[in-house]
Amino acid sequence: MRYLILISGFMFCGMSLFAQARKDTTNSVKIIQTYKPTLIEARKIETLPVIEKPKPAAPNYTYNIEPKKVKTDKTVSNIPAADLYKTEEFNYPSSFVKVGYGNMKTPLAEFYLNNKRDNKYSYGLQYRFLQTNSELNKTFADFTTHHVKGYLASYSTTGEFGLEASYKQNKFNYYGYKDTSKIAEKNLGRTISNFEAKAYFNSVSDKSNKIKHRTAFNFYNYQIGKAIENDYAISSKIYGNVSDFNDLENGILSATIGFDYTTFQHLNQKSLNRIFLTFDPRFDFKYDVLNVSAGLNTTVYFNGSDTAQPFINPFIKVTYPLIENIATVYGGVDGRYKKQSLKSIIQTNQFTSNYNLTNIYENIKLFAGITAKVGSSADAVFEINYSDVTNMPLFISTQDSFNSFTIINDQANILKFTAAFNYSFSEIARIGFTGNFYNYNFKTQPQPWQLPTIEAKVNMNFNIKNKVYPHFDLMAMSLQKQRTGLSETNYSTNTINAFYDISAGIDFRFRPKLSLFVQANNIMATRYQRWYNYPVLGFNAIGGLTFIF
């Protein structure tokens, strides 16, 4: 019992550390993007939805369902352009080549080369090309994308070592420009390039009392126009088992240590250099039927000139088996200081022209939920969480000739409810549903600009005699409020209508190594808007062949 008293004291100290007043997190760089008078081939990244599909559980699984944490620094995930290519429901045993063509003069080419199964090495190379040419002269919504990726990994009795590298280039346009602005029309083109590299080592050991670690070094160079961001990060999770004592069992003591150095440069402006140090200790154990994880989320921030700014938040998660092997309830406390970056801004809304690099502080997040499993066919999760966020980013339209976006930050309280359900009819059919419901309360802003209050996704997959694989996706989003204008006393507002998007396709494997695919997006041909003044492409479809070798 005395150990429980010590642990309680430890958590009380963590709560008192959290009680420190949040510090000034503002580090704003506002930039009005300039462009050379050239019109390049374009890529519209987000205007059709890529649906984050619920993953129906495979039949006869035996794992326990782990609840998925809900991020609130960006309440709505970015919706990139529709995957005109559709990932097959079966796994390729080795390498493949995929080619296709669509109704918007859409060529698709993809290949994936890898070695056969090997217990010592794995390596591979992948390339993807996708382009549209819809001749929508009034929208300039077409895009071009190239993506190449390579990897190498080796396995031994001491651990796994791996290298990865990728390069992705997206060309797209501003196309929400004002029709009367001929200057804007000549400066629509934007190009995003992103190079990423990773080296990692995961140690392994058959001895339960030996300390292990998972260490990774990550680098990326991200560029859009004249704005360039470089990021160097290394993190290591060190962990080991702790001998049982008294009523505490299955103890694991761990700590994740991270170093992140980010540079940002635009035109002739002075470079912005930032350092983020993280230290997250954890103690995981089982007490009676409770599984407990307790510790701290610690971030120390340096921006090159100010003194170090520490941010410390407690972390607690407790799970309880309500009905053994059927239902589990969980709850806890979380929170963290988070980096805002050029990469995350553009990946969320690539029509942004003012880059506000104000960091985000999730002061506290309270969460509770229940997971359930019914036999080997169905599983579900329900979660409610409340977050208090400093400097939550909101996208608003500027009044420039492109109708581009900028970011304003505000204090936010967010209540979110998530429900997800998956059901499998043996291997013949699988269906998944996820829904998110939000309630926002901002300190200064009257509306959650460009954020929905409801979003839902449905995914269905079928397997007909291991030859025909139809699939169906539906994505829906509630209406949103939109603001145009930087002045807090003089701006206009609009309503973006609620919308839904239906996608469907079929994969037909008429030979063991040769299959036909057809994918159709936005079947209802609704020119809805995810971002104000940027209507999505209409109905689009692509079909082709996949050859496995």
PLM region descriptions:
Residues G189-Y200, A216-D288:
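Outer-membrane beta-barrel transmembrane domain signature of Gram-negative proteins
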Residues T132-K149, E164-K212, A216-D231:
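Flexible loop and strand-edge segments within Gram-negative outer membrane beta-barrel domains
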Residues F18-T87:
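N-terminal periplasmic/intermembrane-space "pro-region" immediately following the signal or transit peptide
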Residues Y92, V97-G100, R128, N291-G295, ...:
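Exposed, low-structure sequence patches enriched in small/polar residues
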Residues Y85-Y92, R117-K120, Y155-E160, V204-I211, ...:
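Short loop/turn motifs that connect adjacent beta-strands in outer-membrane beta-barrel proteins
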Residues N114-S134, E249-T262, L272-N303, S426-F437:
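Surface-exposed extracellular loop regions of Gram-negative outer-membrane beta-barrel proteins
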Residues S77-A81, E88-V97, Y101-V148, G159:
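Outer-membrane beta-barrel translocator/receptor signature
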Residues F111, V148-G150, A197-F201, Y232-G240, ...:
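Membrane-embedded beta-strands of outer-membrane beta-barrel proteins
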